[in-house]
Amino acid sequence: MTQVTIGENEGIESALRRFKRQVSKAGILRDLRNHRHFETNLEKRKRKAVAVRRNRRKSMA
């Protein structure tokens, strides 16, 4: 869990920026998007296979 303590002379904007940075580094939003809907094992395999194909195509170009 990400926590940010605000210092005495620190503004809310800078604390919010630090919080957003910590959330993005921890990958919380990406994880939330991935778990938004249930995904069966078959769907996971298909998604990963498509990603592999896409990466191969990018590396060839």
Swiss-Prot record:
Keywords: Ribonucleoprotein, Ribosomal protein. One of its GO terms (molecular function) is structural constituent of ribosome. One of its GO terms (cellular component) is ribonucleoprotein complex. It comes from the Bacteria. GO terms for biological process: translation. The keyword Transmembrane helix does not apply. PANTHER family: MITOCHONDRIAL 28S RIBOSOMAL PROTEIN S21, SMALL RIBOSOMAL SUBUNIT PROTEIN BS21M. Belongs to the bacterial ribosomal protein bS21 family. This is Small ribosomal subunit protein bS21. It comes from Synechococcus sp. (strain JA-2-3B'a(2-13)). The gene is rpsU.
